[in-house]
């Protein structure tokens, strides 16, 4: 048995072409359309987009870009909220070990902006989010939150 397996393996490795069998589709296109199930699209009451960056001007230009995208795709836009920045301060010594009176002061400010999109279907939301994620500027981070609409369970409806 082991000898047969070794001979099969050696013949497969020696041959330059591999024999692969594929099954041709024998289903008519009309029947194929019936097979595909129609799933209902998700509905979102709101999508909250939060984006952060260190440059205030970059966030402002990205905000105008998002507003223009909403206008052209006819997506209803909710509130635009500019949150206060987060300040991070780190004092450090100039020297490695001594000279405590010579210090450096490192500071970063993270500016935060939130934009809300209202009443969107799942396909529109995925297209919109893919487009804005492809065009996000360098140094800007994004966080997206969804609020999905779902029907009540049958136990509550009755």
From Swiss-Prot:
Q: Name one GO cellular component term.
A: mitochondrial small ribosomal subunit
Keywords of the record, alphabetical order, are: Mitochondrion, Ribonucleoprotein, Ribosomal protein
Give the family from UniProt.
Answer: Belongs to the universal ribosomal protein uS10 family.
Superkingdom of the organism of origin: Eukaryota
* Species of provenance: Caenorhabditis briggsae
User: Any idea what this protein is called?
Assistant: Small ribosomal subunit protein uS10m
Q: Which Pfam families match?
A: Ribosomal_S10
Location in the cell reads: Mitochondrion
Q: What is its main location?
A: mitochondrion
Matching InterPro entries, A to Z?
Ribosomal_uS10_dom, Ribosomal_uS10_dom_sf, Ribosomal_uS10m
* Key word Ribosomal protein present: yes
